[in-house]
């Protein structure tokens, strides 16, 4: 009778050990899920910050591009005016309208 009682106790201890192991695994899984949720929140915040920063960068870069485009246009206009003045002077000197 003791052998069957001892075997029953061993079986109960084995089951309790298995239950404890499953409990530990489930606790670890819950901790991992909570950590993952925190990481996702952190990632979401970083994504929102990056989106705001990218919008600011986009508008700033467009303003800078527009500014330099106008600078180039002004420079081209100035060069064209200078070339035109030189051509007019050359033509006037060549035709004798302006005496040398």
Swiss-Prot record:
Q: Where in the cell is it found?
A: Lysosome membrane; Late endosome membrane; Early endosome membrane; Midbody
Task: Please list every transmembrane segment annotated in the UniProt record, as residue ranges.
Answer: 75-95
Under the heading PROSITE patterns, the entry gives: SYNAPTOBREVIN, V_SNARE
According to the UniProt record, which cysteines are disulfide-bonded?
none
Residues where Phosphoserine is found:
4, 17, 54
- UniProt keyword list: Antiviral defense, Autophagy, Cell membrane, Coiled coil, Cytoplasmic vesicle, Endosome, Lysosome, Membrane, Phosphoprotein, Protein transport, Transmembrane, Transmembrane helix, Transport
List the residues marked with site Binding to STX8: 32
A matching Pfam family: Synaptobrevin
Q: In which tissues is it expressed?
A: Expressed (at protein level) at a high level in kidney, lung and spleen; at a lower level in testis, liver, brain and heart. Expressed in kidney and retinal pigment epithelium derived cell line.
Q: How does it assemble?
A: Forms a SNARE complex composed of VAMP8, SNAP29 and STX17 involved in fusion of autophagosome with lysosome. Found in a number of SNARE complexes with NAPA, SNAP23, SNAP25, STX1A, STX4, STX7, STX8 and VTI1B. Interacts with PICALM. SNARE complex formation and binding by PICALM are mutually exclusive processes for VAMP8. Interacts with SBF2/MTMR13. Interacts with RAB21 (in GTP-bound form) in response to starvation; the interaction probably regulates VAMP8 endolysosomal trafficking. Interacts with STX17; this interaction is increased in the absence of TMEM39A. Interacts with TRIM6.
**Per the similarity annotation, which family is this?**
Belongs to the synaptobrevin family.
Name of protein = Vesicle-associated membrane protein 8
Which source organism does the UniProt entry give? Answer: Rattus norvegicus (Rat)
Q: Give the source lineage, highest ranks first.
A: Eukaryota, Metazoa, Chordata, Craniata, Vertebrata
Q: Which gene encodes it?
A: Vamp8
């Amino acid at each position: 009778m003791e052998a069957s009682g001892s075997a029953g106790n061993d079986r109960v201890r084995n089951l309790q050990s298995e239950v404890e192991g499953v409990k530990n695994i489930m606790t670890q899984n819950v901790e991992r899920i909570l950590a993952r949720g925190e990481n996702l929140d952190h990632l979401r915040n970083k994504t929102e910050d990056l989106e705001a920063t990218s919008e600011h960068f986009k508008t700033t870069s467009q303003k800078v591009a527009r500014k330099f485009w106008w600078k180039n246009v002004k420079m081209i206009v100035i060069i064209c005016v200078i070339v035109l003045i030189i051509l007019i002077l050359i033509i006037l000197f060549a035709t004798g309208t302006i005496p040398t």
